[in-house]
Amino acid sequence: MATPAPLSALNRAIRENDLVEVTRQLGPEPGMRAVEFAPGLSRWQWEATAARVVNPFGFVRGGYLSVFAGALIDSAIGTALAEGELATTAEMKISYIKPAKPGVLQGEGRIVQKGSRVAFVEARISNAQGDLVASVTSTWTVMRAD
């Protein structure tokens, strides 16, 4: 993974919809790429075909789906942070709905509610046919970067 940019630079890239820079910073696995950002929303795509991401039964490993979910929720919260705000995950729950076969996966992260101290973010991961394969809810602690 690349050396992280200063947080303000990463937040600026998210706000400016700089998909290449955000993918470089937050795309922790080859094949993951940012597709779209809007206030409170992030969309990513992942070509989950590398042998290491597939379990012995032929499905994408849950841990890798969790990493993909992390990119979705990280960038969704990043779209809503004001200058000087930071956020960290307080809790994350992932429910695996349907086994994910290797191939293209789509993901969407969305802010449910953001206050001055707590934010609630959700993500959905679907296969190329549009079937839901994982649902994620997360709670974030929001703080000032003092």
Model-identified regions with their sequence ranges:
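Terminal targeting signals and extreme-terminal segments of soluble enzymes
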Residues: M1-D146
